[in-house]
Amino acid sequence: MRTSQYLFSTLKETPNDAQVVSHQLMLRAGMIRPMASGLYNWLPTGIRVLKKVEKVVREEMNKGGAIEVLMPVVQPAELWEESGRWDQYGPELLRFEDRGNRNFVLGPTHEEVITDLVRREVSSYKQLPLNLYQIQTKFRDEVRPRFGVMRSREFIMKDAYSFHTTQESLQATYDVMYQVYSNIFNRLGLDFRAVQADTGSIGGSASHEFQVLASSGEDDVVFSTESDFAANIELAEAIAIGERQAPTAEMCLVDTPNAKTIAELVEQFNLPIEKTVKTLIVKGADENQPLVALIIRGDHELNEIKAQKHPLVADPLEFADETEIKAKIGSGVGSLGAVNLNIPAIIDRTVALMSDFSCGANIDGKHYFNVNWERDVAIPKVFDLRNVVEGDPSPDGKGTLQIKRGIEVGHIFQLGKKYSEAMKATVQGEDGKPLVMTMGCYGIGVTRVVASAIEQHHDERGIIWPSDEIAPFTVAIVPMNMHKSEAVQKYAEELYRTLQSQGVDVIFDDRKERPGVMFADMELIGVPHMVVIGEKNLDNGEIEYKNRRTGEKEMISKDKLLSVLNEKLGNL
């Protein structure tokens, strides 16, 4: 490709509304342009990267035995009504009517469509297992699209769905897809973790997220220092260690009129924060017990995903408002505690090991100090309620936990029979009777993968693609002052034709631009290998080579240039 025949839309300045590095660099590199909130045009440089990511995904999925299909973006409402998600899905689901007043949606996901397709096409257990995938546009009407294509309303996703007669068959395909995803992200050169995860609105049982580690990530990824354990913080089990110590002081009621938060209590009374507890009131699952207290240590954070799995707690978790709390307990939120509490309470495992702690007295402006379980208050139900923190023991007993930010780029689920039962997707079983199929689903955010690679691999000059496979071009030819030097132009043209004939994805910068501009643009878009042709060096029989990833520069004899490039690219 010649730059003179290419839409090369780089920007010198960073747009003011771009908050994260990937958004900034994708705009500056001429990969994307905004059209409306959460909607982007993909320009030639961006589409080249996108298609190369799709190629890797497609090749690895095919190797794993999946079969490609393509399903409509527009889906009839009847399928969503049949699955039950028409009423369950929130405003992210864009609904509309056609001119016949029939309801449709723009698909945020395709479980209903694929289940309908398979129940029509597959009739016998002999046709299973079956794993179908597509690479298709999705639309979710995000309330606040942000971070460029990282969280846009329209995006491209690879979604696969497998169908089985048994849980064992599903597990086998799930294990294959786990390895396929690992192969994809390794091939793309990404630093990632496969972590245990919550199934969320998709439903099902077992689930793993594939998280690219990056400081701009929205998720907290937890992993062990000494084992393969890794989990999303929502699912990571918090292990409480040690034993509860014997009381050392009598419980006392203290006036605390100006201490309505843990921070204020700690500061005003010089208390160790790990000797305080906080009490949070949430809605109960049982109408006879409409409010439930959740009690965690003062320096810990409530894990809402864990909490809503307790049978006493409403799912999804909902906090009670201050009016409800005041009416039932008699005090405001700043004075709540375990002593003399008139609603069911659940305490975190760490709290169960505490002694001589401080908590609200359920009287406005008062706290109890030196509270001890069993002596001053009966120990309530104990449950894992908190987020883990760095240094906690790993749940597998090996090492301690570290926490890093992550960007979710892939997610695999064991759906079970959630959709197949609702939509009566059956096959004839081995015994001749109808058998409800068991399902798995497996998604990769293709557009998000592009942004994640940039978040993880960049410098002050621009993008550094982690793999040559996904760079927009593999080699850049930069001839300095070519239009003033016949020798430079001739050599550059010959090299360009040779590389093209050998299948190298090469960009030839034939613009009438200053060398500094040409270098800056090629570094900005992240071309991994740059060949710089200057008249003086050419007279000496040498060509300059630059490696974008390592920063390496070297002079190479022009007679050996192709063999050296062959070694560096490994595919000439």
Curated annotation (Swiss-Prot):
Name the CDD domains on file.
ProRS-INS, ProRS_anticodon_short, ProRS_core_prok
Task: List the InterPro entries.
Answer: aa-tRNA-synt_IIb, aa-tRNA-synth_II, aa-tRNA-synth_II/BPL/LPL, Anticodon-bd, Anticodon-bd_dom_sf, Pro-tRNA-ligase_IIa, Pro-tRNA-synth_IIa_bac-type, Pro-tRNA-Synthase_IIa_type1
- Matches recorded under SUPFAM superfamilies: Class II aaRS ABD-related (SSF52954), Class II aaRS and biotin synthetases (SSF55681), YbaK/ProRS associated domain (SSF55826)
UniProt-recorded Gene Ontology molecular function terms: aminoacyl-tRNA deacylase activity; ATP binding; proline-tRNA ligase activity
Quaternary structure (record): Homodimer. May form a tertiary complex with YbaK and t-RNA(Pro).
The entry's function note states: Catalyzes the attachment of proline to tRNA(Pro) in a two-step reaction: proline is first activated by ATP to form Pro-AMP and then transferred to the acceptor end of tRNA(Pro). As ProRS can inadvertently accommodate and process non-cognate amino acids such as alanine and cysteine, to avoid such errors it has two additional distinct editing activities against alanine. One activity is designated as 'pretransfer' editing and involves the tRNA(Pro)-independent hydrolysis of activated Ala-AMP.
Name this polypeptide is given: Proline--tRNA ligase
Source species, please?
Haemophilus influenzae (strain ATCC 51907 / DSM 11121 / KW20 / Rd)
